[in-house]
Amino acid sequence: MARIAGVDLPREKRIEVSLQYIYGIGKTSAKLILERANVSPVTRTKDLTDDEVRRIRETIEQNVKVEGDLRREISLNVKRLMDLGCYRGLRHRKGLPVRGQRTHTNARTRKGPKKGLVRKAAAPAPKA
């Protein structure tokens, strides 16, 4: 099993698909990586030679930010927006949609489950 960027790639899938198991690599970047590393995209992961795995690993390390580094950069970017106090930062802080979507209806994913109506407790019956 090939291990690239701390991720075990599935053996039976084509390398083009296997690379997409790494956070930060999608279809397009997987194709570009394989093109730069001179590896056929239809090769199965189990059929890769050690040299091909090394070339893929080096290409990813040099050209693409993946896994922990990418996650860290994204969280720092969001934190920076919140520290600035700009509109996008405030929306992140409040847990609301950031990109201009409506919130009167919808946006349940960002806002969380509905807060139910809290009704007053029924008043006890007056004593006779």
From Swiss-Prot:
Compositionally biased intervals (Basic residues): 95-118
Gene Ontology CC entries for this record: cytosol; small ribosomal subunit
Keyword Ribosomal protein: yes
Region (Disordered): 95-128
Recorded superkingdom: Bacteria
This protein's record includes keyword Ribonucleoprotein: yes
GO molecular function annotation: rRNA binding; structural constituent of ribosome; tRNA binding
SS bonds (residue pairs): none
Pfam families: Ribosomal_S13 (PF00416)
InterPro entries: Rbsml_uS13_C (IPR027437), Ribosomal_uS13 (IPR001892), Ribosomal_uS13-like_H2TH (IPR010979), Ribosomal_uS13_bac-type (IPR019980), Ribosomal_uS13_CS (IPR018269)
Subunit description: Part of the 30S ribosomal subunit. Forms a loose heterodimer with protein S19. Forms two bridges to the 50S subunit in the 70S ribosome.
Function: Located at the top of the head of the 30S subunit, it contacts several helices of the 16S rRNA. In the 70S ribosome it contacts the 23S rRNA (bridge B1a) and protein L5 of the 50S subunit (bridge B1b), connecting the 2 subunits; these bridges are implicated in subunit movement. Contacts the tRNAs in the A and P-sites.
Family: Belongs to the universal ribosomal protein uS13 family.
The protein, known as: Small ribosomal subunit protein uS13
Organism in which the protein naturally occurs: Anaeromyxobacter dehalogenans (strain 2CP-C)
